[in-house]
Amino acid sequence: MIDFGNFYSLIAKNHLSHWLETLPAQIANWQREQQHGLFKQWSNAVEFLPEIKPYRLDLLHSVTAESEEPLSTGQIKRIETLMRNLMPWRKGPFSLYGVNIDTEWRSDWKWDRVLPHLSDLTGRTILDVGCGSGYHMWRMIGAGAHLAVGIDPTQLFLCQFEAVRKLLGNDQRAHLLPLGIEQLPALKAFDTVFSMGVLYHRRSPLEHLWQLKDQLVNEGELVLETLVIDGDENTVLVPGDRYAQMRNVYFIPSALALKNWLKKCGFVDIRIVDVCVTTTEEQRRTEWMVTESLSDFLDPHDPSKTVEGYPAPKRAVLIARKP
């Protein structure tokens, strides 16, 4: 059973303590609910991983842990087998004692695009909404954050995060909670809030922006990354049944329309800091994610379009401030 007690003890002593009025009951309810059919297998994989404290830990340039002496072939094989039990691995990569987890997404590329535009993360308390396996949280810690809290209801991602955390020496500077943003009270407690790859999955995107704002302290910074299309401030794509084979894509605005949405929600100092087309080098099938990936979702005769005929995925990063 994954234990959240360390997180409760941690926030009991800081400005997130008021979260304890609701959080333990929510987590207890989650633990009582019907778990995914493979959850026991996943949590066992975490449990059977060895307790290792890294001799060298690099979270600034990557997520890399190394031991003072090389692990035996048997130890490496054990780690690799258990981590493969947690496939598919979508967000990464991770390099853990000679086991290189080549994930579907090169999330390090996204981080390299975002990082130069952020306010200094040193000492900050951060919320990462829809954090997946938690890759970016470890990079936030590497960039100096005091505490990174991720929320994502996907149970596999929770187990992937806990597996990586265990191999990083049970590092307590990052925590993942199996919750959605709609389950959080208006904490108004985070210096920086990240929402990357979430907005287009929300039926009400403006409500999502308000929810993000409710988590920020005054003068806090929002980092928003999402799918966009070309166009002016009035351009929004509402896909039909699917977009790039995804059923749960509701609104894809232009970057300028998204800027207006942020303004409408009361954000200020709104900047479009990056816009780029997603390539099949950044998102692709690997040995750690063996099912369909981006190349399967694009028109084989015209990769500038999805298989449904929409513009191929393009992503923008916007940064804004809560006054």
Swiss-Prot record:
Keyword tRNA processing: yes
Biological process according to GO: tRNA wobble uridine modification
Disulfide bonds: none
Domain of life: Bacteria
Keyword Ubl conjugation set for record: no
EC category name: transferase
Catalytic activity: carboxy-S-adenosyl-L-methionine + 5-hydroxyuridine(34) in tRNA = 5-carboxymethoxyuridine(34) in tRNA + S-adenosyl-L-homocysteine + H(+)
Similarity-based family: Belongs to the class I-like SAM-binding methyltransferase superfamily. CmoB family.
Name listed for the protein in its UniProt record: tRNA U34 carboxymethyltransferase
Organism (species): Escherichia coli (strain 55989 / EAEC)
